[in-house]
Amino acid sequence: MKKILMLLMLLPAILMVAACENPDTKDKVVIDFWHMSPVGSPTFSKMRAIVNEFNNSQDKYFVKGTGFSFWDYWDKISLAISARTAPDLGLSTIDDVYGRAKGGVLYNISEMIAADTSENNIDLDEFRESQKQFARYEGDLYALPFTSTARVLYYNLDILAEKGFTEADVPTTWSELKTFAKHFDVVEGGDIQRLGFDPTYGNATYHGWLWQTGEDFFDEDLNPTLNTETHEFVLQWIKDFNSEFSRAQLQTFGESNNMLGIDPFAAERVAMIVNDDGLNQKIVDAGGTFNYGVAPIPIPDEDGIRVNWGSGFSIELYDNGKNDLARKEASFEFLKYLMSEETQIKLAEANGWIMSHISAMEKYTADKPLLAKILVEVDYAMDKVYVPYAPSWHGNDWQPFYTEALEGKKTVKQALADARAHYIQKKQNWEATN
């Protein structure tokens, strides 16, 4: 009797162990791949199918795919890299590959490509040099461009039609943008119900607007260039765009959008917005029924430059210091599969992203007019420079000063001066210890 009771007590543990033994992995090299399609997401089943196709195509390797939500992913991968427990393959941001490569946590992909004599090696000519340059460290590639993000101006055709406008009327310059946007503002009882446009919404950024003037946030020596007339002009233009509204009105409207939990353009609360290719998929996933289009982001009236912030994802092979050559080999084989023309098309279909493979995306967008327009803007996309003393220079470092200027707590000139002093101090502190 005691033996029977003991067996019954142990049975759950026995079943659990048995369940964990996957017969598909027997005698195979098992590697981990982290992505952004978690269980329950609209993209999960398609991403799983892509991984399974590789696993079923050969009997030497087995890839375990794990998906995290976009926001959870960054904390997970950052902690894993720091702890040297990173997956064999994962996604990151391409414009800061330099820091990870210098830190010794990435495998040298150039060496792996050079050593590969197979017929399915990676064709580097299929990836844009404008992205590959950010994936290099000391001349070699330590990552590959995974997506080719571009930012464009989305416009709601139904809202435009309310005022008798069509695609032919979509603005191309900053002055046209402001004049056009004012046709679509709706205010009821002192509360904003709809905005034509706001230069801080969506994926619009200060440095993105600045680049259109031909100026950058840093000079060639990575000193901040915040004390110029151009900076003052750009920041003042952003601040004044909706100056007929109080900051309280704009904040209330912005907060109400956040409470809805969806993009304000997808919710039809703004007529136009700057965003990336991902917004199109969000609208599709949300079941949006309104008509919309995309166009290049309007540029300054005088000497404006057609440029947008890319900020695409990189794909990286992580070196956790274990010298596991079998897993390294398996990771490279899976990388070749992911970067092939056929798989890049499937990844675009799964995620709604513009992927990095040039020929693949030309084929994928051939019968998709809106995505084809976004793909054109990829050739005008650029990434932000990596600044070792301020890796988050566009985010946590800049945002407090930007907000103070927008809220009127500081003048544009003072906010820029304080921001410049902040970066200079960070640079001095970094140089003193590096």
What are these regions (language model features)?
Residues 18-105, 115-122, 167, 254, ...:
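Conserved N-terminal structural module of periplasmic/extracytoplasmic solute-binding proteins
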Residues 178-183, 221-255:
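Glycine-centered hinge/linker elements that transmit conformational signals in sensory
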Residues 69, 94-152, 178, 209, ...:
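Hinge/lid segment of periplasmic solute-binding proteins
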Residues 67-76, 172-178, 251-266:
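Short helix-initiation/N-cap motifs at beta->coil->alpha
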Residues 20, 125-126, 295, 348-396, ...:
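Long, aromatic- and glycine/proline-rich binding clefts that accommodate carbohydrate-like moieties
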Residues 110-127, 170, 187-197, 215-235, ...:
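Short, solvent-exposed loop/beta-turn-alpha elements that line the ligand-binding surface or hinge
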Residues 137-146, 151, 175-225, 270:
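Extracytoplasmic/periplasmic solute-binding protein
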Residues 52, 56-57, 163, 243-247, ...:
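Extracytoplasmic/periplasmic substrate-recognition and gating elements
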